[in-house]
C-alpha cells in the first residue's frame, strides 16, 4: 500500500513504463489495467528477464477496471432503454390524444407499436447483458457463489456461458479482456501458492473451506435472531480440520496468509488517485514537486479501516522515521532545506567578497 513511484513523465509509452520498472529487480507480480503503453512496458521487462535468465515477472489484468468498464456499458444500455421507453410513452399519449379528439389514430398507433417494440427489445438486451455480466463477474472472484475455491476450469466454463450474452459493439472491450490470459493470472498464483503452503490436497481443501466459513459468520452488529448455522459452521469445520491434522494450526496460518494476500485489483491506485486529484481545480499544473508532496501525504496518512487501521503505509513498510505526521515531516524538511539554502548563500557571499 506504499506509493513508491510518482514520476511525471513526458509520455506513457512502453519504453517509459519499461524504464520505470527496470530497477525493481525483485518484483514478482504486477497488477495493471489494459493500457497499451503500460502492457507494452511490462512485456518488455518480461522479455528482458527471460533473455537474461532472471526470475519471471507475472502480469495480471486489473479486475477493478474490468468491472468498471462493464458497469459503464450497462449504464449506457440502460440509458438507451430509458430514452426509448420515454419515447414509447410519448407515442402512446399521442394515440390516446388522437382518439379523444376523434381523429384517425392509425398512423400514430403504428408509430407507438414500433416505439414499444424498440423499447422492449432494448430492455431485453439490457436484461441479457446484465445476466451475462453477472455470470462473468462471478468468474472473476476468488470463491464461487457456492463457497468453493475458484479455478481456471470453472472460470473458463462461466466465461463461455457469459460471452454469448455480452453481444454488441459496446461489449467488445470487456469480451477481449475476459478472453485474455492475464485476466486469470491471479488464479494461477493463488493455486500455486496454496499448494506450496499445504501440499496435501484434502487438508488444503479443508483449510480453505474453514477460511471461507470464518468469513461467513454474522457480524457482531447483526440485529435480531440469527437464522441457520452460519454462526457455528466454522466451529464444526474446525473440528473436522483438527481430526485431519492435530497440528494444522501452522498450515492454516499459511493458507490464510495466501488467501488474505491474493491481489486481483489495484484498488489502492484508485485510492491514491483521490489524493492526486485532490484540489485538482486549483492545481492546473501538476508539477513533480507537487506530486512528491502528495506522495508524502499518502504514505503518512493513517488507514481508517480494515486490517491496516491506525497505521500509515510507511509504518506498515517498516520504515523508521522521527515522526509519521505529515506536517511534522514537512516542517523538518523545510528547516533542513532552509539551513542548506542559507549555507549555500553564505558560501556564495564569501566567494564574492574574496
Question: Where are the language model's segments positioned?
Answer:
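RNase H-like nuclease fold core
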Residues: 1-49, 73-143
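C-terminal domain-tail junction helix/linker
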Residues: 203-209, 213, 219, 223-227, ...
Amino acid at each position: 500500500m506504499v506509493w513508491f513511484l510518482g514520476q511525471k513523465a513526458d509520455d506513457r509509452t512502453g519504453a517509459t513504463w519499461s524504464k520505470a520498472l527496470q530497477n525493481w529487480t525483485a518484483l514478482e507480480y504486477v497488477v495493471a489495467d489494459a493500457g497499451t503503453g503500460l502492457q507494452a512496458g511490462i512485456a518488455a521487462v518480461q522479455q528482458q528477464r527471460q533473455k537474461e535468465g532472471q526470475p519471471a515477472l507475472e502480469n495480471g489484468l486489473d479486475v477493478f477496471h474490468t468491472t468498471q468498464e462493464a458497469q459503464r456499458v450497462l449504464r449506457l444500455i440502460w440509458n438507451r432503454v430509458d430514452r426509448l421507453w420515454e419515447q414509447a410513452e410519448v407515442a402512446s399519449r399521442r394515440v390516446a390524444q388522437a382518439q379523444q379528439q376523434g381523429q384517425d389514430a392509425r398512423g400514430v398507433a403504428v408509430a407507438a407499436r414500433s416505439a414499444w417494440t424498440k423499447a422492449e427489445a432494448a430492455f431485453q438486451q439490457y436484461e441479457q447483458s446484465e445476466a451475462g455480466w453477472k455470470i462473468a463477474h462471478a468468474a472473476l472472484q476468488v470463491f464461487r457463489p457456492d463457497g468453493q475455491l475458484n479455478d481456471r476450469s470453472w472460470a473458463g466454463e462461466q466465461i463461455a456461458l457469459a460471452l454469448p450474452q455480452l453481444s454488441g459493439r459496446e461489449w467488445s472491450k470487456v469480451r477481449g479482456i475476459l478472453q485474455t490470459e492475464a485476466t486469470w493470472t491471479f488464479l494461477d498464483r493463488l493455486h500455486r501458492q496454496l499448494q506450496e503452503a499445504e501440499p496435501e490436497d484434502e487438508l488444503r481443501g479443508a483449510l480453505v473451506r474453514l477460511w471461507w466459513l470464518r468469513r461467513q459468520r454474522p457480524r457482531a452488529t447483526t440485529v435480531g435472531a440469527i437464522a441457520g448455522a452460519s454462526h457455528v459452521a466454522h466451529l464444526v469445520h474446525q473440528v473436522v480440520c483438527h481430526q485431519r491434522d492435530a497440528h494444522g494450526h501452522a498450515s492454516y496460518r499459511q493458507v490464510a496468509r495466501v488467501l488474505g494476500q491474493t491481489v486481483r485489483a489495484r484498488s489502492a491506485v484508485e485510492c491514491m488517485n483521490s489524493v492526486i486529484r485532490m484540489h485538482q481545480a486549483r492545481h492546473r499544473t501538476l508539477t513533480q514537486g507537487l506530486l512528491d508532496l502528495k506522495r508524502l501525504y499518502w504514505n503518512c496518512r493513517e488507514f481508517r479501516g480494515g486490517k491496516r487501521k491506525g497505521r500509515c503505509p510507511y509504518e506498515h513498510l517498516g520504515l523508521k522515521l522521527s515522526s509519521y505526521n505529515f506536517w511534522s515531516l514537512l516542517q523538518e524538511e523545510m528547516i533542513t532545506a532552509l539551513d542548506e539554502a542559507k549555507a549555500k548563500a553564505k558560501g556564495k557571499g564569501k566567494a564574492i567578497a574574496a
